[in-house]
Structures are given as C-alpha cells and as structure tokens.
Amino acid sequence: MDFDMDLAKQKNNDNPVYYVQYAYTRMYNILHKEGTPEFTPVEHYDLLTDSKEIELTKQIAEFPKKVEEAAKHRAVNRICNYCYDLAKLFHSYYNSSRVNDPSNPQLTNQRLGLVEATMITMKNALDLIGVSAPEKM
C-alpha cells in the first residue's frame, strides 16, 4: 500500500479523510443551524420517497453487515470504504435536496431524521477506524 503524504495534508475533496469528515461536519451543522426545527422522532418515514433518500437509507441499513464482514475478514479497509461511500451518497443528497423546507414541516422532520441517522452511523464508523468526527472544519 502506498501512502501519499501530500494528499493526506490536503484540505479538499481529493483527500478521502477530509471528504468524509466534511460530510460529518455538514450533517452536524444542518442539525444545529439556527432556525432549523428540532427533529422529533416519528414512527414512519413515508415522505422520504426521493431516490437519493432511499439510497442513503439502504446504505445506513448496511452498516451492521459491513462491520461484521470487516471483523470476519480482518479488513478494516471495508469500514473506510463504507465511510467514503456513505459520505458520497450524503453529499449527493445534500446537493440535490432541500432538507429544511418551511412549507412542508413533516417532510423537513423526516429529512432531519435521515440526516441524524446518517450522522450517527458515520460517527460510529469513524470511531471504529480511529478517525475524528469534527463538528467544525
């Protein structure tokens, strides 16, 4: 395995660690931004019908399986790849969807729930590989 020290020092999306941490920071800031309503857990997330929301939900659901596979095969790189894939899906979702839609509070609440679930999953994955999950970058 080759380690590119110059790439590791870069603070841009070319650096995969920065890319993943930036996704986490973005999630954190969405949930803590002034004027954002507080997420209230709901029983059903039936308003999350966008294809990117469904992809993100499926990726979150894969996390326990990915952890089990990584442990079974002693392949921590699988968690690294999972983090990158989750970040990629989240960035794509963020760039195409408006999480906080004041005209539709129920949809906003469900989207905030999706962001929170993604953030918790990312934090757990980063903890497993010893990478920090910064609230600010």
What are these regions (language model features)?
Residues 1-137:
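Non-catalytic interaction-recognition regions
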